[in-house]
UniProtKB/Swiss-Prot annotation:
Disulfide bonds: none
InterPro entries named in the record: Chemotax_Me-accpt_rcpt, HAMP_dom, MCPsignal_dom
KW Transmembrane helix (keyword) present: yes
The protein's name: Transducer protein Htr8
Domain HAMP: 273-326
Domain of life: Archaea
SUPFAM superfamilies to which the protein is assigned, alphabetical: Methyl-accepting chemotaxis protein (MCP) signaling domain (SSF58104)
A single MF term (Gene Ontology): transmembrane signaling receptor activity
Species annotation: Halobacterium salinarum (strain ATCC 29341 / DSM 671 / R1)
GO biological process: chemotaxis; signal transduction
Amino acid sequence: MGESARGGGSAETTGGLAAAVKTYLEYTPTGESIPAAAWRRRHRNVRVFVLAHIPLLLALGLYEGTESAVTGATIPPTPGILIAAELGIVGALVGLASIPSVSRRGRTALASTAVLASSVVLVQFSGGFIEAHFHFFVGMAVIAVYEDWLPFALGLVYVVFTHGVFGMINAERVYNHTAAINNPWVWGGIHGAFVLLLAGALMANWYSTERSREASQKRLEEARQKAQQVEDLEARQAEIEAEKAEAKRLKADAEEAREAAEAQQREVAALNERLEATANTYGAAMARAADGDLSVRLDPDVENDAMAAIAASFNEMLDETETTIREIQAVASDVAAASEDADAGVVEIEDASGQVSETVQEIAAGADEQREKLETVSGEMTDLSAAIEEVAASADSVAERSHETAAVAGDGEQTAEQAIADSRTVQSAVESTVQNVEALDDQLAEISEIVDLISDVAEQTNMLALNANIEAARADKSGDGFAVVADEVKDLAEETRASAGDIEALVADIDAQMQATVTEARTADESVQDAISAVDAVVDAFGTVAENAEETDTGVQEISTTTDDQAASTEEAVSMIAEVSDISTATAADAQQASTAAEQQTTAAATISENTAALREQADRLQGLVSTFDVHDESASTAARSE
């Protein structure tokens, strides 16, 4: 029984321990509870903290010897390559921790490693002073701002690993006492244990803080929920009060609506009574109108719009009916009077119709005689028109020939003017040729002078060659070569003089030919000038011919036009005479028809007389019928409507 109890207690203890461990792990911070803005601010401060170490560590690494002013510590020398490498590693870690694309925990790990690396560099550059190891604990406190267990785990591993490894490589730069120098891994573990204890203490504090924070959050959330419930209750109470006020308002509106309905019911009853009285009055008036009293009217000044509209429409109908009856009465009177007048007029028509018939027969006989005379005139006018047309045709032919003459004269004048232009071009060319030949003559004179100069030079060269031969003869054998050259020069001079003579003769021939050319050109120029004068005379003659031909053409054209107009007028007169003849024929026929119509009119007048008598009887009956209706006087009715 006791063993069972102990077994149960052991199980409870084991279960409680597991629950405690689970709870501890749940509240182990990971840094995720820190807001992003706060985390960025803390991360920036950690990086600034590490970067502030670099100039101090550089100064410590470069220092060598015993510092006697304050500490009395002896600092060993540090190779420059080691200083650069280790400070470069610290700076690189800070740079990597600043890259935004790296995850948040990745940058946390890099910044924490940079802090611990600066602690390692401080210990090495100081020569392993135990006081420098305190910087590890400072670094652990700094990275605690991340509130994450990962930096602590990195710190623990980093402290043990660096103390053990660097203690094996150069223990004197890590530790400054013999025990640690001889056992670097043991003392590295001791440092790690202290770091672990520090981390445990901080994490225990975080655990308590997280528990307190969670409890505070729960209480705050509960307070918020209660405040929200209070606000909801207050809002609900306000809604209830509003609903009560709305219910009271609706009740008051219902009372007002009931009272209004009762009042409206009373008004409807009174209105029905007034409508019934108005309907009785309207019925009596309509009965009088049905009996023929068209002067009766309904009173439109009533309360009901429909009854007022009925009264207005009925009054308007009676106004129109009364006006119509009044007009019928007037028309009946007018018809009776007109019937009497028509009866008297019909008698006069019968007498006039006989006279018209006789007159029309006389007109028909005159129209036949006029037609015969017009036919004779039309034949004579036709012959005259044919003669005028022959004259017009001859005038057209003459006009066409005169027009052709004027055109030929114009073409001849243009051709003569073109010949003058061509002659002037030839004259310009001849003058240019004369000028060119004269210029060539001047150049030949210059060539002649040059040939004379060449002849003089050849003569002088010949004299020099002769003198050279004389000098060569005097020089005996030594002048043989000189004599040969002198002979060649002499021969060349002779050839030059001969060529100059030929050129001079040729220039003389050319000069003679050019003189002849100039003479012929001047003669041609004079001939061209004479031709231009002759052609000018021809142009003037053609101009005169063209003007005369144009005047002739104009006159003939006017004659032709006048003749055409006469022919057209004659044809038009013939046509008009034919039309007059046709009109005379038609007039005779119409006169015959008018005579027949006059006879028919006489017969119709008798019929009209009979119909007029019947119409007078109908008008009397109509007056008797409309006299049964009572209507207002027209002037009085108009005055009443205007009012």
